[in-house]
Amino acid sequence: RQSLAVLAEARRQHQPGRCLLLGAHLEGPFLAPQKRGAHPSEHLCAPSLAELERRISGFEDDIALVTLAPELPGAEEVIAALRQRGVVVSLGHSAADERTARLAYQQGVGMITHCFNAMAGLHHRAPGPVGALLGSPPVALGVIADGIHIAPAMAALLQRLFPEQVVLVSDALAPYGLPPGTYPWDERSIAVADGTCRLEDGTVAGTTLTLPDGVV
């Protein structure tokens, strides 16, 4: 809520000719624990309308996008509540299979936060959320095109299959613009090398990528 308050104030102080802040992306807290990536487990919780209100009350107009795991019990009503408010709901940090993902798209989930990262891959016997895109309503496909999060060939495949739906995502973290090294990151430290941010255990946490760097 502290971050939302800062964003809301920045939006109120918008100056003509300056970058327009369209709204916050809440990547959590309704994430699958086994797919949490770099998100601390103590920050996660089960989806419910009460938990949603506790986090966004007073800032409803400042939130543009929410990432959640649609397979979690309670997610369906949270998705409906967010869509009613005009918030884009994105599948991410999720263990959803093809069937669950397809149902989520039909319920109004309109994006995949970062394709192939912290979610099931595209397997010939288990197509997962990406396979569920075929025959579903159009969904925006977030792609972290740093060559680490997703292989360049797979990024090119997505672009070929869904040319109007791919959205570049920088996934840039606080060390953006800083040289390689180790930096404090919340209560942890994060190592930056070759444009990639990793936790001490080697978990890929994000990038220091600019969006133009992802264009070839």
Positions of PLM-derived features:
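Conserved strand-turn element in the central/C-terminal portion of the radical SAM core barrel
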Residues: 1, 68, 144-146
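Histidine/acidic-residue-rich, glycine-tolerant segments that coordinate divalent metal ions
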Residues: 3-127, 175-177
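Active-site-adjacent C-terminal substructures of enzyme catalytic domains
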Residues: 78, 100-216
